[in-house]
Amino acid sequence: STHSDRFDLNSVYSICSYSKGELFLSQLIYLIGKENTMKTLKRYFDEFKFKHPTPNDIKRTAERVSGAELDWYLTDWTQTTNTIDYGIKDVSEANSSTNITLERIGRMPMPIDLVVEYVDGTKESFYIPLRMMFFEKENPTPEMKRTVLKDWAWAEPTFTFSIPKSKSLIKKISIDPNGFMADIKPENNSFEITK
């Protein structure tokens, strides 16, 4: 979308055209799952080989394969300087349950994969879909119990949910513990509960 001669430095052009393009595809894995992304790439190649596709073509192919709505993703990723930054804002206990409040600090919305590790060594996964995607991603960790929470509306800066367990039973809470989301400040993605 931005012509190469509009960049002041070649290195900036390289980052915007190559690195950001690579991250676009890796974020698709985070958004729609690995299997859907691989199917998308195969179908995209089959449909557009020897042609001149546009950015909308990869987005439309991913939408057809997965069923997710991805207009917002293409717009945020290619036409803005919005960043992805989520954090754990607060962890509190009430009535033998633990309330967890997450916050969207950056302007780019994303669905959230969150893992709670308990003091007994077990782990539980929570998935917070993004409302404007109209989609629920396949479970990337089928060996772990997964709870799908209500959708997070993109305009809401915070999201709070409860776990029906005491805070004393929780060891660590992590947003995207595998590091697949392009969060610019991953150090605020985990919360360790010290005794």
Each model region followed by its residue ranges:
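Exposed regions on extracellular, virion, or secretory-pathway luminal proteins
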Residues: 79, 166-168, 184
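Short acidic/polar inter-strand loop motif in beta-rich domains
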Residues: 177-187
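Terminal edge beta-strands and adjacent linker/stalk segments
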Residues: 186-194
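Beta-strand-rich binding/interaction modules
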Residues: 71, 84-159, 164-176
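Amphipathic alpha-helical substructures
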Residues: 5-7, 11-100
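Long, contiguous hydrophobic alpha-helical segments, chiefly transmembrane helices and signal peptides
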Residues: 62, 114, 181-183
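Extracellular acidic, Ser/Thr/Pro-rich low-complexity tracts
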Residues: 64-66, 104-106, 183
